[in-house]
């Protein structure tokens, strides 16, 4: 059925469908996505489908219309009112190809973390796809730029960026330039790791001048986490420990108990003794907060410096 839909859609695709890396002469817009793919849009898209929650908010920021959207499943995540009646194509982790095709999109905006295979399937049928990553604050601003360009609302995107910059900078200015030493531990039911400055929470910590104990790790530039070691944690002895997680809360608690709290060395850590171990909410620190970036930065800053920053 899927193959038939793809062939049918390819057969009736308009002649001016966007091409990847084709001629940009007279094009409405030419955009390079986070794969390095050059996407040429001959005309302004009229039926845009967005496949992740954070990217939905970027579209809403420039008042962009949608023909389809991802389902909002994450705890406490909110769907912009503008998109309540827009057909959903499934959750970000399990988007339905059939539902995307049913929206008859002339542009799909997808997540680099989840939609590589789906993007390839859509592109085989000459449906243009922008694949974007959203990890750091710089990603947030770049995505705003791109989506503003898609909708022809570059000025609105720039205005929103300026608003975000001002809010984030105000928080950073309110905390010490030489920040406390922190560890950001990520737990899933199967493993425990330590987050790098390239992760969502790590990027925020860096903007708050916090010293990430994993900041000196050598990586390929794309890695956001490295293996956890209690020995390394004890040696670094951070002032504050943040916990992020993904998966069933019962299974995660079991993993944390087995790999972290069950180790006698855990109790010797300065952060543990001082009661400075904090669980970070999924809506801000597992998923990129997007336009709520200032709220997320303020949340972290308040945990570390409650006397200086209020949520």
Identify the residue ranges that each predicted region occupies.
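A short, structured surface patch at a secondary-structure boundary
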Residues: 53-103, 107-112, 210-213
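Flexible loop/hinge segments that line or gate small-molecule binding clefts
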Residues: 79-81, 114-146, 150, 278
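Structured C-terminal subdomain patch of bacterial secreted/periplasmic proteins
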Residues: 141-142, 149, 158, 172, ...
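Extracytoplasmic ligand-binding site segments that recognize negatively charged/polar headgroups
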Residues: 117, 133-146, 181-204, 249-251
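Proline-aspartate-enriched helix->loop->beta-strand connector
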Residues: 96-110, 127, 229-243
